[in-house]
Amino acid sequence: MLDREGFRPNVGIILLNARNEVFWGKRLREHSWQFPQGGIKYGETPMQAMYRELHEETGLHPEHVKIIGRTRDWLRYEVPDKFIKREVRGHYRGQKQIWFLLRMVGRDCDICLRATDHPEFDAWRWNEYWVPLDAVIEFKRDVYQLALTELSRFLRRPAQRADKPQGPRPSSRYPRVIGTQSQQTLTIVDTSVVCSEIEVEASTLDEMPPRVIVGK
């Protein structure tokens, strides 16, 4: 289903935990990371499509999340010809998306990447809100920046620690790169184990599959 300009209606999902970290999924058998997203079927509202895609890609149900915001209008990106099937070239241009910001009220173990027979992700982690755009496929980066920036107004500020010195806070706007230099410990879900966590170590976000250190 395309609009007159050749864009397919679509929804994107930014899923937050209680610490304002976002669900960050590694695409199946690829080295790129992204948010859950998917097309709106004929007769669906954007909200209905969002809940369907949420379950298909993360295993979560409506009772596991709370909607706290959405973009005011469609955000568009064009797909390069090399990623478009030959039979639809000249008609299909890309995606137009409504983005939803969700707060997870369930538990991490409610997330299951094998909720369907065709999973989108083979690993996931919680990442800082301002995700590293260099881990995202290039033609989606501008839309990610627009969606994150527009929806950031809905974020609640985490409580300030009493012993933390007050002072100017660094800007949280792009450009910003997270976790590309220093070694860090990531928590992902291996889809071979339903709703269980393993601790892994990687020197960069795109070093996948990571080396397993110890099971939790």
UniProtKB/Swiss-Prot annotation:
Nudix hydrolase domain segment(s): 6-149
InterPro entries (UniProt xref): Nudix_hydrolase (IPR020476), NUDIX_hydrolase-like_dom_sf (IPR015797), NUDIX_hydrolase_CS (IPR020084), NUDIX_hydrolase_dom (IPR000086), RppH (IPR022927)
The keyword Hydrolase is annotated on this UniProt entry: yes
Gene that encodes it: rppH
SUPFAM superfamilies: Nudix
Function: Accelerates the degradation of transcripts by removing pyrophosphate from the 5'-end of triphosphorylated RNA, leading to a more labile monophosphorylated state that can stimulate subsequent ribonuclease cleavage.
Requisite cofactors: a divalent metal cation
EC number: 3.6.1.-
Family: Belongs to the Nudix hydrolase family. RppH subfamily.
Gene Ontology MF: a single term: pyrophosphatase activity
Annotated keywords: Hydrolase
The organism of origin for this protein: Burkholderia ambifaria (strain MC40-6)
Motif (Nudix box): 38-59
Protein name from the UniProt record: RNA pyrophosphohydrolase
UniProt KW rRNA-binding keyword: no
PANTHER family per UniProt: ADP-RIBOSE PYROPHOSPHATASE (PTHR43736), DIHYDRONEOPTERIN TRIPHOSPHATE DIPHOSPHATASE (PTHR43736:SF1)
